Amino acid sequence: MRVKDTLNLGKTKFPMRGRLPETEAQREALWEENKVYEQRQKLNEGKPSFVLHDGPPYANGPIHIGHAMNKISKDFIVRYKSMTGYRAPYVPGWDTHGLPIEHQLTKAGYDRKKMSLTEFRDLCQKYALEQVEIQKKGFKRLGVAGEWDHPYLTLAKEFEAAQIKVFGAFAKRGLLYQAKKPVYWSWSSESALAEAEVEYHDVVAKTAFFTEQVQDGKGLLDSDTYLVGWTTTPWTIPASEAVAVSADFEYALVQPSGSDRKYVVAASLLGDLAQKFNWTDYQVVKTFKGAEMEGMTTKHPYIDRELLVGLADYVTDDAGTGLVHTAPGYGDDDYNFGKKYNLPIFAPMNDQGVLTAENGPEFDGVFYQDADDISLRLLEEHDALLLEEDLEHSYPFDWRTKKPIVFRATDQWFVSIDKMRDEILKAVDEVTYYPTWGKVRLRNMLKDRGDWVISRQRVWGVPLPIFYAEDGTPIMTEETINHVSDLFREYGSNVWFDREAKDLLPAGFTSEHSPNGKFTKETDIMDVWFDSGSSHQGVLAERDYLTYPADMYLEGSDQYRGWFNSSLITSVVVSGHAPYKSVLSQGFTLDQSGKKMSKSLGNVIDPNKVVKQMGAEIIRLWVMSADTSADVRVSMETLQQISESYRKLRNTFRFLLANTSDFGPENFVAYEKREAVDQYMTVNFNHFLAGMRDEFDRYDFLNAYKHLINFVNNDLSSFYMNVAKDVLYIEPEDSHVRRSMQATFYEILSGLTKLLTPILPHTTEEVWSYMDEPEDFVQLTEIPEARTFENGNALLEKWEGFMELRSHVLKCLEEARNAKLIGRSLEASADLYLTASQQELLADLGTDAGLLCGVSALSVHDASEAPAEAESFSDNAAVLVQAAKGEVCDRCRMTKEDVGSDPAYQQLCARCAKLVRENFPQTVEEGLEK
């Protein structure tokens, strides 16, 4: 018999290498085949519900790493809730309408003007559904559990029908109105945009300081006086109707030396402006308040038009001249000013951003960006240009086409936010936010939000269910809305485009505004944010196993102005409360340098590729490790580091499995009867479990990750599993000390496997398949609640004191290793010179301190006896590490002076010789081979 045959070496077929790209897919197929998600839902029937409502990603293109972070984060929470006493169904969804899909078809060669609207919409639907399948495959491959066979789609008939009812709630409350107002206009999309569809980029603009001659100065200013205006959009000057000044500002009438003109600018800006205009010598003729200028008129610099001077509180003196050129058709503030002074709302531009002849013959047919130069030339020709200079500033862009947009007055349908702002803000306060600053972010977005333009001049979307009478009166009564909703539920929204208005109205419908019984219908569609913002009705209220409001909405922080925002508004209108009880927001995924990922920069981390190379578990563990409350940097190097952490976790599972392979329920040892170190680790694990559950409950996965890695690396790998080898391998198979440790091992193995299932379901299911448990899948078990122990806190405190002592021993061992005094720790002996209280602590452990410190011999002495060469630490205590005396035992690998003391076992220490003699008596005669 060989020495190793006398050892209880752990055995398991659980592989060291996970081969994740291959095995994960097999496991996912097994889950699908066995309907594990459905089984979990059935198990949770009758339990309190927790509904995380999925914010629908846009159905266009394969999933990216931001998608992965979002969906995996949701999966953590849903799986955790499902395994801790909640019924937590998860219905994934997709946003399937909108301009990008139209663009994709145009790019593919389809011309929507050469086919019927329904034909084009059918192509859009086909494309959207194809994209849903592509993304669905990607999400499922990440291990995300949910109703993949029954997701929600904003193009679904029942969703569209519910959305029409939401629109009806706005109509019923009188919150909808039609107006010609400046809106964000995307010439590249040929449509109005909502605030949530706009992003800002820094651009360099041509700015102009220009003059307008006073025509009627109200006795305060003469006709040789010129008001100095400033604009960052010279192309809007042809549409100028007025000059805005601040009532409270002090304005200066300035006469530059050698000039026959006088100029008016804000007094606070005069110093800077004089420098800009090279007014080296000038006289301030007089100063006056802006309020005195109200009602004056000036001449347009190059068009035969009189301009009004009026008062506005949006005028500032932090840039420009303190006098603002005002074109009511090209800006929100300008529009409100125009309404106040009854000015024409003039925006002479077509849908493609091309100026019309109303601007003047020079501008007819000119793209607005090219019109800057024409306007500047005309200013110069009319001696009205004081200065042209470039300015870098933030400018709005269409978030989808990445092209600049304009403010342009067009006829649109709006939701009046002002009428319900107080209700909306009250609803904000009733929600819990993770992180807490989310409340302020959302509140500020809604506090300052303008009216919501909900009409879009596009084809692929849900039509505005508005009819028009013969005299132009809009019709959207409860009767017509409900009828359209019913039609959509039966036929889908294509019916709106297929039928005439009369065939979409209820049978026999009449209106006093249509004496001849003729009606027309609206051709615009709804903003897609109205689509997704209605999902609380289209999904939560539509499916009886979900709850409204949802327990949580979880999305990127951009959704404070997007989905969180639109959903809140629609929900308040429909039911008077928020659609969610809590909101969790996340940052964006960036590359390792903090840059946005883009194919052109070559810095994209493609989750589909990572899954094929490394496995979904690596992405999942990375998500757990990331501070998702802020922007998250990720690179292949990051994922490589995470794969190292994964390898340690996997090896831990493997060690626990191997060393419990011969352990069954009949071998169980109750906590009270366990050895001291096992009692400590039982309490310690439950303390860890309680902390992890608390962090999961608070959605603090980052700290949970830190605690997990710390527990696995330090408590298990560096300490307990190290100590365990001497017990599990060396002691008799059925000895109490070994079974005590195995009982603890198994509890940790079982608890850790269940606890990590929300995070690493592929791996924990693999581990579970090697455990002898009644449930076929670990997902169908419950995460255990942490146990409490009567002496638990005192025990942890005592062992914490010992761990402090042990850390000093380990430090000295490392120094001895570096000095080549020893190789392995078991080649060392340690002499501890301790205070009385420290000696008492060691004696009270009830365990061999040498074994716990990983040395072959440990002696305890009084602190006063410490020799000079001993390394001191707290309370005058000291440690002296030396090479252990004796020979290495072939069985336990300890260095002992009693090796060979039993003549039958010359290569074994006395302890091992005794154990072998008792358990393998045949070896006394046969002997042992190395």
Swiss-Prot record:
GO terms for molecular function: aminoacyl-tRNA deacylase activity; ATP binding; isoleucine-tRNA ligase activity; tRNA binding; zinc ion binding. Its main location: cytoplasm. A motif ('KMSKS' region) lies at residues 596-600. ATP binds at residue 599. One of its GO terms (biological process) is isoleucyl-tRNA aminoacylation. Disulfide bonds: none annotated. One of its GO terms (cellular component) is cytosol. Zn(2+) binds at residues 889, 892, 909, 912. L-isoleucyl-5'-AMP binds at residue 555. Its cofactor is Zn(2+). The keyword Flavoprotein does not apply. Binds 1 zinc ion per subunit. A motif ('HIGH' region) lies at residues 57-67. Keywords: Aminoacyl-tRNA synthetase, ATP-binding, Cytoplasm, Ligase, Metal-binding, Nucleotide-binding, Protein biosynthesis, Zinc. It is found in: Cytoplasm. Its EC number is 6.1.1.5. Residues 1-21 are annotated as: Disordered. Monomer. Belongs to the class-I aminoacyl-tRNA synthetase family. IleS type 1 subfamily. IleRS has two distinct active sites: one for aminoacylation and one for editing. The misactivated valine is translocated from the active site to the editing site, which sterically excludes the correctly activated isoleucine. The single editing site contains two valyl binding pockets, one specific for each substrate (Val-AMP or Val-tRNA(Ile)). This is Isoleucine--tRNA ligase. The gene is ileS.
